[in-house]
Amino acid sequence: MWTSWWLWPLVAVCTADSFLDQAVQILRVTPVIDGHNDLPWQLLNKFNNRLQDSRANLTVLADTHTNIPKLRAGFVGGQFWSAYTPCDTQNKDTVRRTLEQMDVVHRMCQLYPETFLCVTDSAGIQQAFREGKVASLIGVEGGHSIDSSLGVLRALYRLGMRYLTLTHNCNTPWADNWLVDRGDDEAQSGGLSVFGQRVVREMNRLGVMIDLAHVSVATMKAALQLSTAPVIFSHSSAFTVCAHKRNVPDDVLQLVKETGSLVMVNFYNDYVSCASEATLSQVADHLDYIKNVAGAAAVRFGGDFDGVTRLPVGLEDVSKYPDLVAELLRRGWTEAEVRGALAENLLRVFREVEQVSNQAQVPEEEPISLEQLGGSCRTQYGYSEAPSLHRRPGALLASLSLLLLSLGLL
């Protein structure tokens, strides 16, 4: 399919493992598109986003899960880089910090043009494959990054965001996060508020993939039922295999199957084995389970490299993808199923999201109400009326009547 991949440095496979040999042959033709990598966050923490610092050189960077030699060795041909800002930025400087992390991805492409090609659509991914480069896309991790603004959502799209995780480890004013299911946060939106539904519709209109990693089960179901395009879980695993609330339960996996959506398995030990230690084989157990419940077309990889502190034995960094593919082949996965998990399932969903988008359609314009927002550092104009006034149309008129009576004008 993408024949120029033979130009990449060949991986020496000094082993009698025929499954690993086969895995390498598959990866040379169909490289992996990983759904979630937090290298930009590491570049912020270690170098304050100074990419020209000699220590930040991605050809030699040693203390991260990701660098250019590791990407090459792992046959990573596409990567959704995470533009992540922590929840403590919500109602503060989250938009600024999100823009800075998106800028890091663009500068990576500028500094290493022989390796990275920043793209924004499915055709761009295939172009990068043909050129033997890593297709570099941006996923914004956390709905708080749009600061409850449809205008910010649209602006981030124009700057390259192609998926938005509806929450991180905190509620937004319009969507509930997974900690609600654990009892650590209170449900505020019942999944998605009215404004949250507007966000989903606008993402469909724009062609932004809806990412349900980190959200509550109620939010998962609400978004899956509302979205007119398939959705993704960019870095989540199977709840039945490991009963962690960040993972996807069986009834949601059924909705994933019905909607043609994707679950990109996370490699974080705590989500893989529900313990501090895990193995590559246990990651394959999650992939097997999702394939059996939701179908092979639903399976993907979302390693969460450089975003987690513990990774399975055998999957220590991005170079280890050939070993994971070999394990799937060893378990009887067909070559077509493997190619789907590597890239083709994602390309299918991306194309469907692009087909559903209709930017000629009138954009969502109704802003959120000021009463629904947290924080005190906000101006008072440009918001909707409180939802209670929308539910009771006579409330505003009654309030005005009381005011006029008090002034003796009625």
Swiss-Prot record:
E.C. number: 3.4.13.19, 3.5.2.6
Keyword Lipoprotein: yes
Compartments in which it is found: Apical cell membrane; Cell projection, Microvillus membrane
Regulation: Inhibited by L-penicillamine. Beta-lactamase activity is inhibited by cilastatin.
An example Gene Ontology molecular-function term: zinc ion binding
Family, similarity comment: Belongs to the metallo-dependent hydrolases superfamily. Peptidase M19 family.
Protein name from the UniProt record: Dipeptidase 1
Species whose genome carries this gene: Oryctolagus cuniculus (Rabbit)
Taxonomic lineage from the root: Eukaryota, Metazoa, Chordata, Craniata, Vertebrata
